[in-house]
Amino acid sequence: MSNNGSSPLVLWYNQLGMNDVDRVGGKNASLGEMITNLSGMGVSVPNGFATTADAFNQFLDQSGVNQRIYELLDKTDIDDVSQLAKAGAQIRQWIIDTPFQPELENAIRDAYAQLSSDDENASFAVRSSATAEDMPDASFAGQQETFLNVQGFDAVLVAVKHVFASLFNDRAISYRVHQGYDHRGVALSAGVQRMVRSDLASSGVMFSIDTESGFDQVVFITSAWGLGEMVVQGAVNPDEFYVHKPTLAAGRPAIVRRTMGSKKIRMVYAATQEHGKQVKIEDVPQEQRDIFSLTNEEVQELAKQAVQIEQHYGRPMDIEWAKDGHTGKLFIVQARPETVRSRGQVMERYTLHAQGKIIAEGRAIGHRIGAGTVKVIHDIGEMNRIEPGDVLVTDMTDPDWEPIMKKAAAIVTNRGGRTCHAAIIARELGIPAVVGCGDATERMKDGEKVTVSCAEGDTGYVYADMLDFSVKSSSVDTMPELPLKVMMNVGNPDRAFDFACLPNEGVGLARLEFIINRMIGVHPRALLEFDDQDAALQNDIREMMKGFDSPREFYVGRLTEGIATLGAAFYPKRVIVRLSDFKSNEYANLVGGERYEPHEENPMLGFRGAGRYVAESFRDCFALECEAVKRVRNDMGLTNVEIMIPFVRTVDQAKAVIEELACQGLKRGENGLKIIMMCEIPSNALLAEQFLEYFDGFSIGSNDMTQLALGLDRDSGVVSELFDERNDAVKALLSMAIRAAKKQGKYVGICGQGPSDHEDFAAWLMEEGLDSLSLNPDTVVQTWLSLAELKK
């Protein structure tokens, strides 16, 4: 395989490691590194070989084609899209027309014969690996070609030639210029690998870090049916999974969140073999769309491999994987440094200050907001229509589009998931993108003004009109010490990993209502009595509960995922989860809810909180919440999760709810379980010592306490100006509660809106000796720093 005793033209993966990047590029060096070092640790990589940078440079040198290439590039205006396209096409044709040197062709022939082992049906993947590719500060995502299901030596040779030419794709030329790479300093290596038969199973991409927030305690996995190109290109909306690393390391169930993608199409082997037609795209049968493309066990196994790879490289990694449909075995087919989050950024908080009509929604990429004029682009020929500040709307972006993507204020696509090329490039460029909207190109019209928001969690929204938004930047490394803990109020698990990156000392209020409303959306009684519902409602519920075995499991499973996400995001800090505090009108708004809820004149003071939990009409619904908490604490081991009981009206009710929790397997003190009570009714403060006999502490709910102390309806605009937590009567009640808790040596914090809105109120609470303030995430840093100033 050597060239007359000089440097080799072809090397096997098991001869390679990361010190060979300059010889075979980042992608091939990484595959060799894993085969050499991680095979014995459960990481499986298909065998293969790589042509070297020397082979590529000799190929260009032999005919003088390199001189023509660099002369043409030097006089091409890269920012002129048509000039770039013309030059790129000319260079690629020159390369394809240039024959391989005989030494290289013979070296590839020898390696191919050994790799195929005379198997006539063997199929191969031929991939590019650039010598500057996958450096931690430059994502060359998808800038060179990949050929799949290549069969026969002649076809492999043609594919290698096309891979060589792909170093001069328009997008690769543009990218090198903008990243400051010299064309002359970059060479290309072709990797030839045995194919994993994922056309008969599933494949996808995973990151050893959360791609949106940079939170590093989870593995993020995407998966769809068939060959992985559909996920990488963004042609499908894949399934998504988050796996918590510490829970995985403890040998416990560690999947904290699952989202089912539509997975409408897949790439499979084509029956007839022609160059460029080795694969075809087909529709996925409905029954396969409606199930997850990986089992929970496979998700955990992939996550273990991701952790092994990350630990070996000592940095966050971006990994492509494939499942073999014949054997069921999981393989790693690529691994490279994760490039966006590993750069480190100043913390930015985008906040939308208005709500408009929602035109489209999909998966949010990043956390930014952009606004501009819609340009619907149907194909690459329309690229020159994009002006700086436009919102690019298209079916799916190809990596060829990178030169125009950087002009856009935002990007919106019909197809794609959070690990596709469009997502990776959008993150790198710092442009908000909403992918996988389904029909954005039909719903959004050329010339209309829109706002694209990725600042509201996993779901990204496109709103009509240019809405007002702001951005705050902060780069606080260490926070000053305070005599109390600054915690956070969090309702949306989608934002948990993002919020966990803020300075914090845990979660003082995690609300279940958001999970029930957004992740479930069905009344628990309608699920427990599913067989009694009419056919239309049953069909609606079946559509909502795809991926779950039963209506009951849907409710418990989704609650478990939501609570586990919150617990994992802040682990090992305490996360106080308040059990459901919907009022009857809010429960009635859930699917199937009207049938089961009373009509109350004032639901705020009606059937809610602890009284609901112990009522015969709701006990078995409450049991579903308890089951979810038990799974999170006992099965997953997230014992940092504590529970909080809202709206406990009487001491007898306190006793009854503690007994009910024990009956449901949540016994105070068992497995370290702490049960906190919301102190939000004047009776709670007046009889604080008696209530505290049944609980491990208080969390003050200043919203309800204020309205009940002052006799106000906080939802009424007529009396809203009188609502003030700083009123002396309210403060007197809070002082009573704080003193009682201190006297018994029990926890007392606050999770109401007051300290987030009024820094003077927060300062008063600190002087009163409160153990913790739980604030809205957007006020944490400012309030923390302000209180520290007061203590100086």
Give the predicted meaning of each segment.
Residues 1-191, 200, 286-297, 302-305, ...:
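N-terminal beta-alpha lobe that positions the nucleotide/phosphoryl donor
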Residues 66, 338-343, 347, 360-364, ...:
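Acidic, glycine-rich flexible loop/linker segments
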Residues 112, 120-125, 130-140, 144-148, ...:
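Conserved alpha/beta-domain cores
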Residues 138, 148-149, 159-160, 202-211, ...:
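Beta-strand scaffold of nucleotide-dependent catalytic cores
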Residues 142, 314-339:
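Conserved metal-phosphate-binding beta-hairpin within the catalytic cores
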Residues 214, 450, 704:
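Small/polar (Gly/Ser/Thr/Ala-rich) solvent-exposed segments
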Residues 218-318, 323-324, 363-370, 388, ...:
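Conserved catalytic alpha/beta cores of large enzymes that bind or transform nucleotide phosphates
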